[in-house]
Regions:
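A charged alpha-helical hairpin associated with nucleic-acid processing machineries
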Residues: 1-175
Length: 175
């Protein structure tokens, strides 16, 4: 009986939890809820490119093939890819990027959920992750094109739009 009283008194301290983590998660969610899936993927790719230039250098061809929807993201990606392909050293690239793209870099760091994932990963793991993100981006981009073509077909049915839609859908199914 005495033991029960002791546990009861002690339980009052256990109930007083720190809700700071929950609050931080809510704030992050509020910031990210306005971002589409494709924007989050863009930020994730840019985060890896910005923080792992060696990995980005190995993926120059794949990175130059994709075109981001957001102009500012596309400009940043192009600036980094161009600098890497010209053979500029990391310090020059970082200085150039940090001076011209401060606002977007801050936004990427605030909204990129990939930071925790890459924290303790090897360069090989990060390279694989970048491959997956690029593939996801291409799929999302194709889905967007399909949606837009379907909408176009609904508005006016023409053979060219229909054949392009079929081609895109079959390409998506193959991947």
């Amino acid at each position: 009986n005495q033991n029960l009283k002791q546990n009861y008194k002690y339980s009052a301290f256990k109930k007083d939890k720190n809700f700071q983590i929950l609050k931080e998660t809510k704030i992050l969610h509020q910031k990210r809820k306005d971002l589409s899936k494709i924007q989050i993927i863009e930020f994730s790719i840019l985060f890896i490119i910005l923080n792992y230039l060696d990995t980005a250098f190995k993926k120059l061809e794949e990175l130059s093939e994709i075109e981001f929807l957001t102009e500012k993201n596309e400009n940043l990606k192009t600036a980094i890819v161009t600098s890497l392909s010209e053979g500029q050293d990391k310090h020059t690239i970082r200085a150039k990027i940090n001076s011209g793209y401060e606002k977007i870099i801050k936004e990427i760091n605030e909204n990129s959920n990939i930071q925790m994932i890459v924290k303790n990963k090897s360069n090989e793991d990060i390279s694989e992750l970048l491959d997956e993100l690029i593939q996801d981006y291409k799929e999302q981009s194709n889905l967007r094109k399909i949606e837009s073509l379907e909408q176009k077909l609904i508005n006016n049915l023409d053979e060219n739009s229909y054949s392009e839609l079929i081609k895109l859908k079959s390409q998506l199914n193959r991947d």
